[in-house]
Amino acid sequence: MSMTDPIADMLTRIRNANIRGSSEVAIPSSKIKKSIAEILKDEGFIEDWEVSSDEDSFPEIKLQLKYLNDGQPVIRKIKRESKPGLRVYLKSNDAKPVLSGQGISIITTSKGVMSDRKCREEKVGGEILCTVW
């Protein structure tokens, strides 16, 4: 069975792992998911990530989720913005901070996948994949 929206599947797996309080979540690997994981790590939303592969199975991205001292997840909300049926685009001059800078948008651009902060620095727009805070 094919998956119609693998990015939404990734975000749902992260959301479900946060609800369960899991320290790690496994996600089927792809280039765009690796880029999203790297941005989440750089912005401080996850501890780390790595790609693991056995000879018998497909490669997986293992995300190590991050929690506060009181056990609350660092990712309070993670939301898919652009969907296969409704694409959402952002012009370079329309990139505004998410929740006054407390969150980020992850955007795919002609220069690669980057956070909204980096888009403002580079003055580039693109498709908004998701928002995290």
Model-assigned labels for residue ranges:
Residues 1-133:
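Core subunits and conserved enzymes of cellular information-processing
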